[in-house]
Amino acid sequence: MRILVEIAYQGNQFLGFQIQQQGRTVQQQFEKILKRMHKHHVRIHPSSRTDRGVHAYQQFFHFDTELNIDNKQWQYAMNRALPDDIYVKNVRNVDEYFHCRYDCVGKRYRYKVYQGNHRNPFKSGTETFVNETLDYDKMNKAAQEFIGTHDFTGFCSQKTEVESKVRTLYQSEIVATKEGFDYVVTGSGFLYNMVRVLVAFLIEVGKGKREPNDVPKLLEDKNRNNVPLTAPPDGLYLEKIYLSPEELIQEYGKDVKIHYKKSLEKH
Protein backbone atom coordinates (compact mmCIF):
# COMPACT_ATOMS: atom_id res chain seq x y z
CA MET A 1 0.00 0.00 0.00
CA ARG A 2 1.35 3.43 -0.93
CA ILE A 3 0.68 6.37 1.39
CA LEU A 4 0.97 10.07 0.49
CA VAL A 5 1.75 12.47 3.33
CA GLU A 6 1.38 16.27 3.19
CA ILE A 7 3.52 18.15 5.69
CA ALA A 8 4.70 21.62 6.73
CA TYR A 9 7.85 22.52 8.64
CA GLN A 10 10.01 25.36 9.86
CA GLY A 11 13.49 24.79 8.50
CA ASN A 12 15.62 26.77 10.99
CA GLN A 13 16.82 23.77 12.96
CA PHE A 14 17.17 21.33 10.06
CA LEU A 15 20.16 20.64 7.82
CA GLY A 16 17.64 20.20 5.02
CA PHE A 17 15.08 17.58 4.05
CA GLN A 18 17.40 14.83 2.87
CA ILE A 19 18.98 12.52 5.42
CA GLN A 20 22.65 13.26 6.28
CA GLN A 21 25.35 11.19 7.95
CA GLN A 22 25.17 13.58 10.88
CA GLY A 23 22.70 16.26 11.88
CA ARG A 24 18.97 16.78 12.09
CA THR A 25 16.89 16.47 8.89
CA VAL A 26 13.19 16.21 8.07
CA GLN A 27 13.61 12.81 6.41
CA GLN A 28 15.40 11.50 9.48
CA GLN A 29 12.50 12.49 11.75
CA PHE A 30 9.92 10.59 9.69
CA GLU A 31 12.01 7.50 8.97
CA LYS A 32 12.75 7.18 12.68
CA ILE A 33 9.01 7.13 13.44
CA LEU A 34 8.20 4.71 10.60
CA LYS A 35 10.98 2.34 11.67
CA ARG A 36 9.53 2.25 15.17
CA MET A 37 6.07 1.45 13.79
CA HIS A 38 7.19 -1.14 11.21
CA LYS A 39 10.09 -2.72 13.12
CA HIS A 40 12.23 -2.26 10.00
CA HIS A 41 13.54 0.63 7.90
CA VAL A 42 11.01 2.38 5.64
CA ARG A 43 12.29 4.84 3.03
CA ILE A 44 10.28 7.98 2.28
CA HIS A 45 10.32 9.71 -1.14
CA PRO A 46 9.78 13.51 -1.16
CA SER A 47 8.53 15.82 -3.90
CA SER A 48 11.37 18.26 -3.16
CA ARG A 49 14.65 18.23 -1.24
CA THR A 50 14.74 21.57 0.53
CA ASP A 51 18.12 22.84 1.72
CA ARG A 52 19.37 23.81 5.16
CA GLY A 53 17.21 26.48 6.80
CA VAL A 54 14.50 26.44 4.11
CA HIS A 55 10.88 26.20 5.28
CA ALA A 56 7.85 24.50 3.73
CA TYR A 57 4.19 25.47 3.85
CA GLN A 58 3.49 22.41 1.70
CA GLN A 59 5.68 19.39 1.07
CA PHE A 60 4.75 15.82 0.14
CA PHE A 61 6.37 12.44 0.51
CA HIS A 62 5.19 8.88 -0.05
CA PHE A 63 6.12 5.55 1.47
CA ASP A 64 5.04 1.93 1.09
CA THR A 65 3.61 -0.02 3.99
CA GLU A 66 2.14 -3.39 4.82
CA LEU A 67 0.39 -2.01 7.90
CA ASN A 68 -3.39 -1.70 7.78
CA ILE A 69 -3.81 1.65 9.53
CA ASP A 70 -6.50 4.27 8.91
CA ASN A 71 -5.20 7.52 7.37
CA LYS A 72 -6.39 9.59 10.34
CA GLN A 73 -4.49 7.24 12.63
CA TRP A 74 -1.34 7.65 10.53
CA GLN A 75 -1.68 11.41 10.89
CA TYR A 76 -2.31 11.20 14.63
CA ALA A 77 0.55 8.78 15.28
CA MET A 78 3.10 10.82 13.33
CA ASN A 79 2.06 14.18 14.78
CA ARG A 80 2.19 12.77 18.29
CA ALA A 81 5.80 11.63 17.77
CA LEU A 82 7.05 14.62 15.77
CA PRO A 83 8.80 17.71 17.20
CA ASP A 84 6.97 21.03 17.23
CA ASP A 85 8.62 22.34 14.05
CA ILE A 86 7.02 19.69 11.77
CA TYR A 87 3.32 18.99 11.26
CA VAL A 88 1.47 16.37 9.20
CA LYS A 89 -1.41 18.17 7.44
CA ASN A 90 -2.97 15.25 5.59
CA VAL A 91 -2.52 11.55 4.80
CA ARG A 92 -4.14 9.67 1.94
CA ASN A 93 -3.78 6.52 -0.15
CA VAL A 94 -2.42 6.76 -3.70
CA ASP A 95 -2.00 4.39 -6.62
CA GLU A 96 1.03 2.08 -6.43
CA TYR A 97 2.39 3.70 -9.61
CA PHE A 98 2.26 7.22 -8.16
CA HIS A 99 5.66 8.71 -7.30
CA CYS A 100 6.08 11.94 -5.34
CA ARG A 101 9.17 12.97 -7.24
CA TYR A 102 8.26 12.00 -10.79
CA ASP A 103 4.60 13.01 -10.66
CA CYS A 104 5.52 16.49 -9.44
CA VAL A 105 5.01 18.85 -12.40
CA GLY A 106 5.67 22.15 -10.65
CA LYS A 107 6.55 24.03 -7.46
CA ARG A 108 5.97 27.47 -6.05
CA TYR A 109 8.41 29.22 -3.73
CA ARG A 110 7.99 32.40 -1.72
CA TYR A 111 10.94 34.40 -0.44
CA LYS A 112 10.18 36.91 2.34
CA VAL A 113 12.13 40.12 2.88
CA TYR A 114 11.39 42.76 5.51
CA GLN A 115 12.81 46.28 5.65
CA GLY A 116 13.25 48.96 8.28
CA ASN A 117 15.81 50.88 10.28
CA HIS A 118 17.06 47.82 12.14
CA ARG A 119 16.81 44.05 12.33
CA ASN A 120 13.90 42.45 14.18
CA PRO A 121 15.23 39.57 16.32
CA PHE A 122 11.79 37.93 16.27
CA LYS A 123 12.02 37.51 12.49
CA SER A 124 15.43 35.85 12.66
CA GLY A 125 15.45 32.66 10.64
CA THR A 126 12.05 33.28 9.05
CA GLU A 127 12.58 36.42 6.94
CA THR A 128 15.60 38.18 5.46
CA PHE A 129 16.40 41.77 6.45
CA VAL A 130 17.42 44.42 3.90
CA ASN A 131 17.79 47.99 5.16
CA GLU A 132 18.63 49.74 1.87
CA THR A 133 15.89 51.51 -0.10
CA LEU A 134 14.67 49.30 -2.97
CA ASP A 135 12.80 50.10 -6.19
CA TYR A 136 10.10 47.41 -6.21
CA ASP A 137 8.74 48.40 -9.64
CA LYS A 138 12.14 47.96 -11.23
CA MET A 139 12.62 44.67 -9.39
CA ASN A 140 9.28 43.41 -10.67
CA LYS A 141 10.20 44.31 -14.25
CA ALA A 142 13.38 42.28 -13.87
CA ALA A 143 11.44 39.39 -12.29
CA GLN A 144 9.11 39.26 -15.30
CA GLU A 145 12.10 38.71 -17.59
CA PHE A 146 12.61 35.24 -16.10
CA ILE A 147 9.15 33.98 -17.08
CA GLY A 148 9.29 31.35 -19.82
CA THR A 149 11.67 28.53 -20.69
CA HIS A 150 15.35 29.37 -20.18
CA ASP A 151 18.71 27.83 -19.40
CA PHE A 152 19.39 28.96 -15.82
CA THR A 153 23.06 27.92 -15.70
CA GLY A 154 24.03 31.48 -14.71
CA PHE A 155 21.47 31.57 -11.89
CA CYS A 156 22.22 28.43 -9.89
CA SER A 157 25.01 27.04 -7.74
CA GLN A 158 28.10 25.85 -9.57
CA LYS A 159 27.69 22.67 -7.49
CA THR A 160 24.49 21.84 -9.41
CA GLU A 161 25.00 18.31 -10.70
CA VAL A 162 22.11 17.90 -13.16
CA GLU A 163 23.05 17.99 -16.83
CA SER A 164 20.11 20.02 -18.18
CA LYS A 165 19.64 23.40 -16.53
CA VAL A 166 16.64 24.35 -18.66
CA ARG A 167 13.58 25.19 -16.59
CA THR A 168 10.23 26.88 -17.26
CA LEU A 169 8.96 29.63 -14.96
CA TYR A 170 5.21 30.28 -15.03
CA GLN A 171 5.24 33.07 -12.45
CA SER A 172 7.96 35.44 -11.25
CA GLU A 173 6.89 38.57 -9.41
CA ILE A 174 7.61 40.97 -6.57
CA VAL A 175 4.68 41.40 -4.19
CA ALA A 176 4.83 44.38 -1.82
CA THR A 177 3.98 43.59 1.81
CA LYS A 178 3.40 45.72 4.90
CA GLU A 179 7.06 45.60 5.94
CA GLY A 180 8.87 44.74 2.71
CA PHE A 181 8.25 42.38 -0.18
CA ASP A 182 7.82 38.75 -1.15
CA TYR A 183 9.30 37.22 -4.28
CA VAL A 184 6.88 34.59 -5.60
CA VAL A 185 8.09 32.18 -8.26
CA THR A 186 6.41 29.13 -9.77
CA GLY A 187 8.20 26.79 -12.15
CA SER A 188 8.52 23.32 -13.60
CA GLY A 189 11.43 22.73 -11.24
CA PHE A 190 14.34 24.57 -9.67
CA LEU A 191 18.09 24.11 -9.67
CA TYR A 192 20.32 24.10 -6.60
CA ASN A 193 20.15 27.57 -4.95
CA MET A 194 18.32 28.95 -8.00
CA VAL A 195 15.61 30.87 -6.12
CA ARG A 196 18.13 32.38 -3.71
CA VAL A 197 20.36 33.51 -6.60
CA LEU A 198 17.34 35.08 -8.34
CA VAL A 199 16.41 36.93 -5.13
CA ALA A 200 19.95 38.25 -4.63
CA PHE A 201 20.01 39.51 -8.22
CA LEU A 202 16.60 41.20 -7.88
CA ILE A 203 17.75 42.96 -4.71
CA GLU A 204 20.76 44.28 -6.64
CA VAL A 205 18.29 45.59 -9.25
CA GLY A 206 16.29 47.25 -6.48
CA LYS A 207 19.44 48.98 -5.23
CA GLY A 208 20.16 50.30 -8.73
CA LYS A 209 23.29 48.17 -9.17
CA ARG A 210 21.73 46.07 -11.97
CA GLU A 211 19.03 46.74 -14.58
CA PRO A 212 16.02 44.68 -15.73
CA ASN A 213 17.39 44.65 -19.27
CA ASP A 214 20.52 42.87 -18.00
CA VAL A 215 18.52 39.65 -17.65
CA PRO A 216 18.42 38.39 -21.29
CA LYS A 217 22.20 38.77 -21.66
CA LEU A 218 22.89 37.09 -18.31
CA LEU A 219 20.68 34.15 -19.27
CA GLU A 220 22.43 33.92 -22.63
CA ASP A 221 25.94 34.06 -21.11
CA LYS A 222 25.26 31.14 -18.70
CA ASN A 223 28.07 32.35 -16.44
CA ARG A 224 27.51 32.25 -12.67
CA ASN A 225 30.48 34.57 -12.14
CA ASN A 226 28.31 37.34 -13.63
CA VAL A 227 25.68 36.76 -10.91
CA PRO A 228 27.85 35.96 -7.88
CA LEU A 229 25.50 36.64 -4.96
CA THR A 230 23.18 34.20 -3.15
CA ALA A 231 20.49 35.32 -0.70
CA PRO A 232 20.41 33.56 2.71
CA PRO A 233 18.00 30.64 3.22
CA ASP A 234 16.09 32.30 6.08
CA GLY A 235 13.27 33.82 4.03
CA LEU A 236 12.71 30.92 1.62
CA TYR A 237 9.50 28.88 1.76
CA LEU A 238 8.38 25.99 -0.41
CA GLU A 239 4.77 27.13 -0.76
CA LYS A 240 3.05 24.70 -3.13
CA ILE A 241 3.67 21.39 -4.88
CA TYR A 242 1.77 20.63 -8.10
CA LEU A 243 1.17 16.89 -8.31
CA SER A 244 -0.91 16.92 -11.50
CA PRO A 245 -1.01 18.85 -14.80
CA GLU A 246 -4.60 19.82 -13.98
CA GLU A 247 -3.43 21.89 -11.01
CA LEU A 248 -1.05 23.90 -13.20
CA ILE A 249 -3.64 24.30 -15.96
CA GLN A 250 -6.18 25.58 -13.44
CA GLU A 251 -3.83 28.37 -12.33
CA TYR A 252 -1.93 29.19 -15.53
CA GLY A 253 -4.29 28.23 -18.37
CA LYS A 254 -4.63 25.36 -20.83
CA ASP A 255 -1.63 26.51 -22.89
CA VAL A 256 0.78 26.10 -19.97
CA LYS A 257 3.91 24.12 -20.84
CA ILE A 258 3.99 20.94 -18.74
CA HIS A 259 7.29 19.22 -17.95
CA TYR A 260 6.96 15.59 -16.95
CA LYS A 261 9.72 14.76 -14.50
CA LYS A 262 10.27 11.21 -15.72
CA SER A 263 12.05 12.82 -18.68
CA LEU A 264 13.48 15.89 -16.88
CA GLU A 265 16.24 15.85 -14.28
CA LYS A 266 15.16 17.80 -11.29
CA HIS A 267 16.32 19.08 -7.96
UniProtKB/Swiss-Prot annotation:
Record-linked SUPFAM superfamilies: Pseudouridine synthase
EC class (word): isomerase
Keywords of the record: Isomerase, tRNA processing
Catalytic site positions: 51 (nucleophile)
Biological processes per GO annotation: tRNA pseudouridine synthesis
Gene3D superfamilies xref list: Pseudouridine synthase I, catalytic domain, C-terminal subdomain, Pseudouridine synthase I, catalytic domain, N-terminal subdomain
Known EC number: 5.4.99.12
GO molecular function: RNA binding; tRNA pseudouridine(38-40) synthase activity
Binding site for substrate: 109
Swiss-Prot/TrEMBL catalytic activity: uridine(38/39/40) in tRNA = pseudouridine(38/39/40) in tRNA
CDD domains assigned: PseudoU_synth_EcTruA (cd02570)
HAMAP family: TruA
Its biological purpose: Formation of pseudouridine at positions 38, 39 and 40 in the anticodon stem and loop of transfer RNAs.
Subunit (UniProt): Homodimer.
Family indicated by similarity: Belongs to the tRNA pseudouridine synthase TruA family.
Protein name: tRNA pseudouridine synthase A
